Amino acid sequence: MRNGYTPSKNKPEYWEGGKIPWFRMEDIRQNGRILSDSIQHITMDGVKNGNLFKANSFILATTATIGEHALVIADSLANQQFTNLSVRKSLKDRIIIKFLFHYMFIIDDWCKNNVNISGFASVDMNKFKKLEIPIPPIEEQNRIVAILDRFESLTTSLQHGLPAEIAARRQQYEYYRDKLLDFKRKTA
């Protein structure tokens, strides 16, 4: 777990010609919750001690818009609104990153309910560090991911979701039409 930061804007060498993604809340709002690139970039000169956030880690807003998160699939940095979360090396073979992506929505809610207000709102990081994440077997993680990815696709994709919804409504219409208009002839 590491905090994000903003390299000095007064040092053009930190920004000009930068290729390293530097994430802000605007990136999530414009590009969604799985990010490979950012709107703004920095140079390696702007990176403290040369330590980037590793690919396949998460950025989680722990101040301001608390609980917003994204899976970042490229080495990067983020501003101070975000805390970077990555999987420990000892757990990498036991965790599917997309499972954690979906579980982050649970963590988002937890963060919103565990806030310190001292000058400005922020997540209670002492409690956060003690937060336990359940890790089901890989097979169960795969099953959960498959189900949640399908629902996500249906709810977020006009290309997939809307046609599926139309097909479901058409099927529902046909069912009720057939039931409502199926008059059995009475024989006398």
Annotate the PLM regions.
Residues 1-188:
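Charged, alpha-helix-forming regions
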